[in-house]
Amino acid sequence: MSKIIGIDLGTTNSAVAVLEGTESKIIANPEGNRTTPSVVSFKNGEIIVGDAAKRQAVTNPETVISIKSKMGTSEKVSANGKEYTPQEISAMILQYLKGYAEDYLGEKVEKAVITVPAYFNDAQRQATKDAGKIAGLEVERIVNEPTAAALAYGMDKTDKDEKILVFDLGGGTFDVSILELGDGVFDVLATAGDNKLGGDDFDQKIIDFLVEEFKKENGIDLSQDKMALQRLKDAAEKAKKDLSGVTQTQISLPFITAGSAGPLHLEMSLSRAKFDDLTRDLVERTKTPVRQALSDAGLSLSEIDEVILVGGSTRIPAVVEAVKAETGKEPNKSVNPDEVVAMGAAIQGGVITGDVKDVVLLDVTPLSLGIETMGGVFTKLIDRNTTIPTSKSQVFSTAADNQPAVDIHVLQGERPMAADNKTLGRFQLTDIPAAPRGIPQIEVTFDIDKNGIVSVKAKDLGTQKEQHIVIKSNDGLSEEEIDRMMKDAEANAEADAKRKEEVDLKNEVDQAIFATEKTIKETEGKGFDTERDAAQSALDELKAAQESGNLDDMKAKLEALNEKAQALAVKMYEQAAAAQQAAQGAEGAQANDSANNDDVVDGEFTEK
């Protein structure tokens, strides 16, 4: 079987690795670097990727950076006189990685395992898979970055039982995953994150500071000058890296712009203390996902054996200190934060080819999935942090008599009401035979594959007709939407519960009216008019309350109707039981008569 390469497709940098024997090895790019900038530029129709593209970013406006942040959206980038989708730009990076991996291996590479942030939604995962396909790669598996890191960390520790926390702060995304390792099984217990938090945000804080200071001194806003801004970005990234090793750095950008008196230069000193002050809010934002993941996993900090740091941004001293303070543990520094994800992806490639044995990877889905049901309620079929691949079915029915079709509205999120969650797709199951409401049986099945990609099926159990959809949304969940879902779910829990209670009550009232009307009709002329009249009276009162919309009145009248309807049902069952008993008695008497009337012949037996 041909080699399966492991690719860490990062926001700012990417890496590729391959399994050699039982060891995962990072493949250096043509410039000898073990990571490649995720940068694409266009010059005279030529596509340039990696270090060369990054070097000319200052002078070449046709340069695309941080494309990963646009994956799963319908946003396009204009360059080279064309419009490109994020998948196409990502595919150019993947092609470059694939090319130098082939040069190293001396053979064609057609398959890859590609990593994504654990908090990537369905659209973003699908977009990543599509990018691989465009690059000529068969994507064997999409693996969550923290999970891949854990795989690389734990490969030589398969005989140990450990619970580890992976803290993954990359260039554009942040994930926290809790895993349990033991006997070769890598079991993800929970994952949380922030899809809009990473090294780029730390760089931006420095850029904003430099722009503000320069404006104070010279009255010129550098953020309006595209070329100056690119130089500031490069300087900010360098300063950030410098401050991981020293306590002060000098930022020097000669001829950054020109004023009325001639050229202007930017000369500024930045201390680590000032950098920490500028980025304090970003460091604070890393704490909530850590607590969320621990809570979802049902673990306390004392139960965590190791904390693994992943991603170049975990080299920032303030981040390391925050991790120590939050977990009470010294982070494990046995893995290279820039390379460990690609190495883990290559190990997963080895698991697929059979070169790595006795390793099982159990990943999870980051957000709950379900459909919209009556009253706009979000009915979850698969909860967040469910191990994948997984499949879940639930039977629903029609909401009206003779309903010919049902709309299946597929959603992802954590809020109780459908309108507050993210639509993944819609489809329709048609040609449902005419029947009273509640009679047709519509089975809805959700499947999440090993890559976290969703497909949904609706089947009419009566006719066996079914419709199927693989979710391929063009506008994936934005980072704000994911963050909003989790934060809103907590902030609005009380209001959500009230709204859901209202809808549930209205649905219950509707169902009770329907069921009681049916019972009253079925018992007409059967001799218990007192109970029927009482039920009818309670039914009329509930309908009046329903019309008024007063929830307390509806609740009281619903209880009264349930009591009267139950009394009517008891009479029905008593009558049915009496009729059945009478029928059985008649059958018994008939059998006895038949036995008594049988002719009996006495005979004499003679032995000869």
UniProtKB/Swiss-Prot annotation:
Record has Ubl conjugation as a keyword: no
Skewed-composition ranges (Acidic residues): 599-608
Region Disordered: start-end pairs: 578-608
UniProt GO molecular function: ATP binding; ATP-dependent protein folding chaperone; unfolded protein binding
Positions of post-translational Phosphothreonine modification: 173
Pfam families: HSP70
Keywords, sorted A to Z: ATP-binding, Chaperone, Nucleotide-binding, Phosphoprotein, Stress response
CDD domains: ASKHA_NBD_HSP70_DnaK-like
Biased composition, class Low complexity, residue ranges: 578-598
Coiled-coil regions, chain positions: none
Keyword Chaperone belongs to the record: yes
InterPro entries, per database record: ATPase_NBD, Chaperone_DnaK, Heat_shock_70_CS, HSP70_C_sf, HSP70_peptide-bd_sf, Hsp_70_fam
Induction note: By stress conditions e.g. heat shock.
HAMAP family membership: DnaK (MF_00332)
Protein task: Acts as a chaperone.
Family stated for the protein in its record: Belongs to the heat shock protein 70 family.
Official protein name in the record: Chaperone protein DnaK
